[in-house]
């Protein structure tokens, strides 16, 4: 599941940088296989945003998400913890 901003970032990578898109897809697979707190991309809880976590896409971009027992919601997949 994506927020509107998260989905717009995802669409951006589809047209601008296939390598980054592949990394995002790899991180999403890792979340679904290993859980939201384990796996690739150095998962970490965001201190300034309660209930949100991030993983490194690359040195400049982060995958920001939140999760419940049933759903993972991608809030952003570009930038560095942006609103």
PLM ranges: what are they?
Residues 1, 14-15, 33-35:
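Short hydrophobic/aromatic-rich motifs at helix boundaries and adjacent loops
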Residues 1, 23, 45:
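Amphipathic alpha-helical recognition patches that constitute DNA-binding helices
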């Amino acid at each position: 599941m994506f927020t509107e901003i998260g989905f717009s970032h995802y669409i951006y990578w589809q047209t601008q940088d296939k390598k980054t898109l592949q990394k995002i897809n790899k991180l999403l697979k890792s979340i679904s296989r290993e859980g939201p707190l384990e796996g690739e991309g150095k998962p970490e809880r965001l201190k300034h945003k309660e209930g949100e976590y991030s993983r490194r896409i690359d040195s400049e971009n982060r995958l920001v998400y939140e999760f419940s027992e049933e759903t993972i919601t991608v809030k952003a997949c570009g930038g560095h913890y942006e609103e």
